């Protein structure tokens, strides 16, 4: 992305995410969602792709989002609010693609995610996290189709990019861009991140600031 690396956006993003971020709500069902407020951005991805770690790295708080070595632990929509004047809310979505999950649990997660995507007017973008070591999987493609149908803008974010050789990463980026060309709701540019090193976090923060500007927040 080009605009998102504007130094002004980078600095504004740094200030917003250096503020007070805190957990506000956990929703196991669509009926228990918090009232809509501000601009929401959600993070989706396969189980253990690193969603919670990325949210912690973004906000500089190691324990804001609970991390787990147990795939599929996050079964709720988890909401985090930042500084009041920022008007930005983060949503940690349930991980998908956990093979050991029961059919009933998968159906419940799927229903929750679909209803959330289709009925949340304040949801401005979904960041779909992809493990940079593995690239897109079939279950990721299913989520992209769901997002297309919901007409929700989304962007691919590679996690754990520091654990992939540069040549392999470039191949996965090229392959992913080819796939995204067929998805109308997809933002064309990818973001490379590492929660361990902090790489890509300034750019991701800046992207969200630009989104706030576009929405007039």
UniProtKB/Swiss-Prot annotation:
Positions of the EngB-type G domain: 37-214
GO cellular component: cytosol
Binding site for Mg(2+): 52, 74
Pfam families: MMR_HSR1
GO biological process, one term: division septum assembly
Domain of life of the native organism: Bacteria
Cofactor(s) required for function per UniProt: Mg(2+)
GO molecular function, one term: metal ion binding
Record-linked SUPFAM superfamilies: P-loop containing nucleoside triphosphate hydrolases
Keyword Lyase: no
HAMAP family recorded: GTPase_EngB (MF_00321)
Function according to Swiss-Prot or TrEMBL: Necessary for normal cell division and for the maintenance of normal septation.
Protein name: Probable GTP-binding protein EngB
